[in-house]
Amino acid sequence: MNVAILLAAGKGERMSENVPKQFLEIEGRMLFEYPLSTFLKSEAIDGVVIVTRREWFEVVEKRVFHEKVLGIVEGGDTRSQSVRSALEFLEKFSPSYVLVHDSARPFLRKKHVSEVLRRARETGAATLALKNSDALVRVENDRIEYIPRKGVYRILTPQAFSYEILKEAHENGGEWADDTEPVQKLGVKIALVEGDPLCFKVTFKEDLELARIIAREWERIP
């Protein structure tokens, strides 16, 4: 059984909106509904768990009617806490693999879902990633240090893992920027799957405007 964990518990403070960004509506759908739709259509996904804050349960319930949705789980104050809540909920389902995705990345393709899961079956863990094409610098005390961009990737989501591996990685708690970091500390090789720029994270108002433009054509994009 392959289960997608859709993280939608963030506060979206950098967006400066009245509601969390994952619940902002673009082209008739809330942001979280775009990746959810991809998971529901994907033959590689058997079930979906949506993680959000208690006060948004009713909103999500009204928007979600599908047999693949296994449940809505209350998220924590941090990303890692939300992932652990989902893993605990999934114990009774005994999934083989779980796929973790940020709801703030609305434009998820089915082919990436399938490929990340395929690579996770080979190594135990895989993540969507994008080669960096920009110049990179580190700034410290007003000094700029250039970082070689060869071999540098941007880590995206979705990220797929053996359920048992991800559960073990989170057993001792901790706070992580994503889930590949604690998994790698177990000595598990992380497979990288080449993504594309469409899988960007909506963080600022400018990102939301770009998302509106893409959403108008999203159903036509293969």
Curated annotation (Swiss-Prot):
Protein's pathway: Isoprenoid biosynthesis; isopentenyl diphosphate biosynthesis via DXP pathway; isopentenyl diphosphate from 1-deoxy-D-xylulose 5-phosphate: step 2/6
GO molecular function: 2-C-methyl-D-erythritol 4-phosphate cytidylyltransferase activity
Class of the enzyme per the UniProt entry, highest EC level: transferase
Documented EC number(s): 2.7.7.60
GO CC term, one of those recorded: cytosol
CDD domains in alphabetical order: CDP-ME_synthetase
InterPro entries, A to Z: IspD, IspD/TarI, ISPD_synthase_CS, Nucleotide-diphossugar_trans
SUPFAM superfamilies, sorted: Nucleotide-diphospho-sugar transferases
Residues making up the signal peptide according to the UniProt record: none
Site (Positions MEP for the nucleophilic attack): R149, K201
Site residues by UniProt (Transition state stabilizer): R14, K21
Gene Ontology biological-process entries: isopentenyl diphosphate biosynthetic process, methylerythritol 4-phosphate pathway
Keywords: Isoprene biosynthesis, Nucleotidyltransferase, Transferase
Reaction(s) the record says it catalyses: 2-C-methyl-D-erythritol 4-phosphate + CTP + H(+) = 4-CDP-2-C-methyl-D-erythritol + diphosphate
Function: Catalyzes the formation of 4-diphosphocytidyl-2-C-methyl-D-erythritol from CTP and 2-C-methyl-D-erythritol 4-phosphate (MEP).
Family statement drawn from the similarity comment of this UniProt entry: Belongs to the IspD/TarI cytidylyltransferase family. IspD subfamily.
Protein name listed in UniProt: 2-C-methyl-D-erythritol 4-phosphate cytidylyltransferase
Organism whose genome encodes this protein: Thermotoga sp. (strain RQ2)
